Amino acid sequence: MHEMTSDVRHLTTDELLAGLDEIRRSPKDEGILALIVRRPTIDAREILERAALDLQEGLVGDSWSLRGSSRSIDGGPHPLMQLNIMNARAVALVAQSPHRWPLAGDQLFVDLDLSGANLPPGTRLSIGSAVIEVTPEPHTGCAKFVSRFGVDAMKFVNSTVGRELNLRGINARVVRPGDIHVGDLVRKTE
């Protein structure tokens, strides 16, 4: 996937703030899995219609299990950062075009309120036949997020309101393996 960031004008802080009301309208208890993206290698993206979630591997075929983390004790993949999930309305705002959503680097994009008040750590979500659990590890943007979506977007997702709503997304782990499909309901189970 080519990034083509030079062809895209990044939104200003005011333009991003104007999109908050739409993001806040995200469903609270039951939403939709809008997009599945597998990252087979660094910076590579595969858009999938269906995928398997596994206890050890996370999203099967994703490179999470091969990526080290400075946040893990042994420097290996962080077990509480197995899945990166972003609100579909938030990514639609910062990316400006559906073909740019995968550039965010998350594996799952859901139309669901990801705020800490709605999905505190420990909350379980069913997606297809799988169940995942929200973890306490914060999900923050990186230099790639800035280059793809702009400095104002990074400041927006990491602002006070951005952190309250988890606009950059949340981390989760698989607690029951299963199959997921784009269009599946995403339901709070606990």
Whereabouts are the PLM-identified features?
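Metal-cofactor-dependent catalytic cores
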Residues: 1-190
